């Protein structure tokens, strides 16, 4: 056979040296077929078995050897597809064997698979009739980044956030039992997602309900970053003991010595381990689950045997498998954090490339043309390090988003002041509250979409007590390819109604830095919201300043002062730049030369600059327009409406036209951030169209 350019010398699970090309003959062994790839193909690879599959029913007749060939073809296809479209990468490569085994054994979609988070569902999409559409994933009008019920009957539950699968699967199981429908429900959850309290709430109830539920714990020692905490150490103990709870033909647990699996080099977390663990030493067994594992999640014959027997066991069952994030692609195995997700490759027509070099080239090209533009997460990271060097009371908390929130440097410089609490948003918020009662000043770095999960704690444990906690809210606004599940478009609505909360929205990197400082220095509960991605290129003027709380700034005025139509455009956050571009174009158009537009950078959502709002009446403003990257209902514009209509006597008399521009009352589908903004009428052209309609 001819050597494939995509394979290299590697080690299989049994330690056998591999240098063989992709094969389709059933005589190949498991060890021979488990390939490691070094390169991402630029052209569509040959995948004859995969190409013949239109749905899970097509693999039911496959032999075990054919399934193992399919695994290699699927892995190679996902490498190619990721290079074409980008997307979540490492998690998908790690569950290919499991995905194939589940669809082979289960009668999907009659039997139902629930994927936690959904980062790992690309292979599932391919096997369920979406192979030819995978190149559109995360693109406008293409496949979604996560399982979505509206996309396929095989996507049994919509996901995107963590730790929801067992609750959803339990609900399905109980409903099926009530309707006397004997179907299997399998929940696939990672060890990172297992750190979320919701997962344990569901497991507790599953035992209480004695539900027939199959939970598969995909343990790769990672979420986006490395898994941490006591639960992670417990899983390591189960692995490092050298024993496993196997399953007999009768379904009974059997404690036995685990075969040596050289493919895994687990982190050693314990200086001493017990020789032989007892079943009662197992957390899942103690809760009341029937536990089997740990098993090699990349061994197809083993997976088929174990899952086939486990799904016949009544009651809640957990099968614990070990996998490698980025399995089969050497650079991703070596750097699972860096390869959690990738951008699509450059468009040059290269047959194959060394992806480590390609990744460096992408990074270089990304930095070119952007000057010194920083990501907002980098601005936060710089502020955090600068302030911590001056104030030893600063402590920083994140729920498993060290890299994404820009906290790597802080964690290295101040490890004793950095607290990654894993995927536990509720705990993160109340933890900060507890810290604040002892005289320190905690900052909680959290994505807007995930702050939703800690809302009760924010009200009850922070704001009600007016505790000195600052929330650095990243990914506020539309987030692009991750779509509606990750959009940060509700935070203003649920924050500004909470007493004692101050809320700031910076227009650029410099304001972000100084508003973070302003909120940190304030004695009370505060929040600064900022978007995903890079800023405008504004330089940060150090040292850190304190802005006046509740003060807006008139940024610019366009159009003649004698114009009969005077429009005040109240822009919140990064929409200031959009407002200025729109106003400049609008007033330069001869059609609108009877209009003057002043751009007001509101800076603060709460408190509003009510003094400035009152002066607008004195200036004879005829139109007031608010502009925000947030839902209109309950957002910053609503706050302006409430003040003008209920608390301003002057406006009760003059009654200027009031108009709100923001995100409409619908979930915004995935696409690029620019496409999403255009979809909502929040790009420059969209804002101009809306202003023209208002002025006409």
What do these predicted regions represent?
Residues 30-44, 221-380:
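Long, well-ordered, tryptophan-enriched scaffold segments
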Residues 6, 30-126, 286-289, 296-300, ...:
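N-terminal amphipathic, basic-rich helices that act as targeting or association modules
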Residues 262-331, 468-474, 492-542, 684-696:
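Structural signature of the thiamine diphosphate
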Residues 350-358, 480-482, 501-502, 631, ...:
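Peripheral docking tails and interdomain loops at the edges
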Residues 152-292, 302-309, 440, 460-492:
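Thiamine diphosphate
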Residues 88-209, 376, 393-394, 399, ...:
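Cofactor-binding active-site loop characterized by glycine-rich and histidine/acidic residues
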Residues 324-325, 329-451, 457-467, 524, ...:
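Non-catalytic terminal/interface segments that mediate subunit docking, oligomerization
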Residues 278, 305-308, 340-341, 373-390, ...:
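Glycine-/acidic-rich phosphate or pyrophosphate-binding loops and their flanking alpha/beta elements
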């Amino acid at each position: 056979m001819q050597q494939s350019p995509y394979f290299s010398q590697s080690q299989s699970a049994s330690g056998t040296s591999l240098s063989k090309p992709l094969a389709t003959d059933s005589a190949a062994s498991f060890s021979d077929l488990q390939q490691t790839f070094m390169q991402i193909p630029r052209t569509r690879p040959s995948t004859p078995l995969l190409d013949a599959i239109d749905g899970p029913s097509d693999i039911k007749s496959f032999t075990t050897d054919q399934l193992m060939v399919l695994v290699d073809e699927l892995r190679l296809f996902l490498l190619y597809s990721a290079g074409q479209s980008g997307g979540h990468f490492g998690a998908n490569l790690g569950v290919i064997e499991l995905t194939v085994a589940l669809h082979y054994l289960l009668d999907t979609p009659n039997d139902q698979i629930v994927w936690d988070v959904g980062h790992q569902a690309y292979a599932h999409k391919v096997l369920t009739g979406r192979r030819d559409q995978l190149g559109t994933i995360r693109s406008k009008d293409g496949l979604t980044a996560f399982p979505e019920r509206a996309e396929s009957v095989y996507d049994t539950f919509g996901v995107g956030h963590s730790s929801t699968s067992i609750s959803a699967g339990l609900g399905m199981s109980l409903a099926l039992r009530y309707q006397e429908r004997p179907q299997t429900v399998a929940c696939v959850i990672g060890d990172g997602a297992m750190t979320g309290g919701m997962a344990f709430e569901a497991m507790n109830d599953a035992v209480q309900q004695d539900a027939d539920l199959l939970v598969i714990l995909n343990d790769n020692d990672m979420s986006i970053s490395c898994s941490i905490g006591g639960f992670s150490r417990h899983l390591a103990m189960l692995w490092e003991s050298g024993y496993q709870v196997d399953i007999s033909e009768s379904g009974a647990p059997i404690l036995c010595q685990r075969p040596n699996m050289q493919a895994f080099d687990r982190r050693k977390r314990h200086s001493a381990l017990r020789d032989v663990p007892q079943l009662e030493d197992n957390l899942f067994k103690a809760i009341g689950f029937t536990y089997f594992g740990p098993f090699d999640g990349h061994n197809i014959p083993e997976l088929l045997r174990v899952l086939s027997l486990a799904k016949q066991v009544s009651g809640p069952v957990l099968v614990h498998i070990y996998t490698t994030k980025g399995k089969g692609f050497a650079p991703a195995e070596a750097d699972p954090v860096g390869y959690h997700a990738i951008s699509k490759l450059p468009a040059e027509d290269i047959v194959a490339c060394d992806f480590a070099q390609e990744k460096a080239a992408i990074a270089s090209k990304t930095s070119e043309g952007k000057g010194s533009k920083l990501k907002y997460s980098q601005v936060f990271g710089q502020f955090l390090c600068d302030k911590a060097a001056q104030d030893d009371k600063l402590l920083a908390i994140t729920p498993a988003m060290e890299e994404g929130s820009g906290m790597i440097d802080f964690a290295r410089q101040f490890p004793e002041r950095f607290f990654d609490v894993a995927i536990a948003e509720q705990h993160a918020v109340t933890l900060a509250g507890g810290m604040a009662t002892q005289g320190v000043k905690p900052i909680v770095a959290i994505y807007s979409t995930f702050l939703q999960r800690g809302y009760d704690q924010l009200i009850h444990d922070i704001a009600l007590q007016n505790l000195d906690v600052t929330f650095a809210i990243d990914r506020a606004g539309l987030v692009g390819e991750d779509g509606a599940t990750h959009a940060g478009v509700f935070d203003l609505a649920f924050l500004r109604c909470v007493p004692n909360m101050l809320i700031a929205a910076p227009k650029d990197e410099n304001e972000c830095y100084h508003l973070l400082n302003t909120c940190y220095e304030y004695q009370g509960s505060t929040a600064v919201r900022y978007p995903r991605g890079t800023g405008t290129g504004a330089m940060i003027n150090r040292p850190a300043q304190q802005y006046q709380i509740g003060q807006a700034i008139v940024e610019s005025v366009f159009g003649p002062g004698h114009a009969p139509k005077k429009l005040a455009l109240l822009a919140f956050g990064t929409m200031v730049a959009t407002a200025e571009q729109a106003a400049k174009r609008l007033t330069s158009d001869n059609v609108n030369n009877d209009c003057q537009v002043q751009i007001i950078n509101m800076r603060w959502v709460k408190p509003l600059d009510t003094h400035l709002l009152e002066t607008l009446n004195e200036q004879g403003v005829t139109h007031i327009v608010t502009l925000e990257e947030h839902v209109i209902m309950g957002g910053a514009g609503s706050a302006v409406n409430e003040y003008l209509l209920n608390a301003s006597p002057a406006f009760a008399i003059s009654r200027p036209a009031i108009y709100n521009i923001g995100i409409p009352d619908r979930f915004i589908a995935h696409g690029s951030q620019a496409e999403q903004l255009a979809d909502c009428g929040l790009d420059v052209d969209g804002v101009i169209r809306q202003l023209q309609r208002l002025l006409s």
